[in-house]
Amino acid sequence: MLKRFVTLALFVPGSVIFAADWALHRGNATQTGVSAEKLPEKLDIKWEFKTKNGIEGTVVISDGVVFAGSADKHLYAIDLKSGQLKWKRLLGILTASPGVNGDRVYIGDADGKFCCLNKATGAVIWTFETDGQITAAPNFDGDNVLIPAHDSTLYCLNKDGKKIWDFKIEGPIYGAVAVAQGATFLAGCDSTLHVLDLKTGKSLGSVDLKGQSGSAAAVYGDYLYVGTMSNQVLAIHLKKLKIEWEFEAPRRKQPFYASAAVNEDLVVIGCRDDKVWALDRKTGKRKWDFLTEHKVDGSAVIVGERIFVGSFDQKLYVLNLKGEKLAEYSLDGAIMGSPAVSGGCLVIGTDKGTVYCLGAK
């Protein structure tokens, strides 16, 4: 339901050119989970790095360094080529994904503290206190950083950690926000998509999602795609601020906690019904589904003609764009985050605290 209408000049090109870095948990500010990287046809495990507790979030990669937050309270910086530790910093329990912007890395913890660190050394530059747990990754608008928190608030801070604005909703915020063309898009536990002006934090409009959302919305062209806890995937027309189509998994009525990966043709999203679903991006019709052995809270990533997605069944699956399995990799624990892709490598963490790097040996 349209609550307020404002015409938005939103033009996110279909053929976005992605940087080699994977500096945000879905690869880009629009949260589409697509990489233009070239990965080897055959992937081998190049190295493993052990932390002392689970990794629930997605690792990020910048300038050949992997940044991983662990529930052992440390943020780790790991060399992408060798898997050797560059530095680690004791913070708080980390279940959120970090984000890199320029020479800084950012992450929030379970106590509601948000930290900005020097990317090269791990030195803490500043911290900001919220009133609720932080499980979402940050996103950025230039030097400004956007932080969703469980205290029902989205915060916008400047590079010095000073609050520019905040926006409150009627429920906790679990997922990251998308950023596109002067606006940020927030789907939260108030069953509403909020469209906000990036500079002021003022509402530009909202859409009733018919269910709570715990994932990041993805913006592609004039449309936004998001899953809900009510067993739905929605496409929202951003100029009209209305639902264009909606999909419900037909049998087991389970929530979509994962974020969607979106390319020109497909919306690919994992569900707690143990399946990965691929929908026609324009119509929402089912193209195919792929059954894993457990729930799929991890978000898929599209790399060329392949889809990479992890499951609670402790496997990383490689599918083609028709949903046919090309390969699978058995890891040491459940996969809750997205793969990160950079430098010809794919990096992913498990709830046993292991970071895996796959590539050409």
PLM features: residue spans?
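N-terminal secretory signal peptides that target proteins for export/translocation
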Residues: 1-2
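Sec-dependent N-terminal signal peptides
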Residues: 5-13
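Extracytoplasmic beta-rich repeat domains
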Residues: 26-29, 47-60, 70-74, 85-101, ...
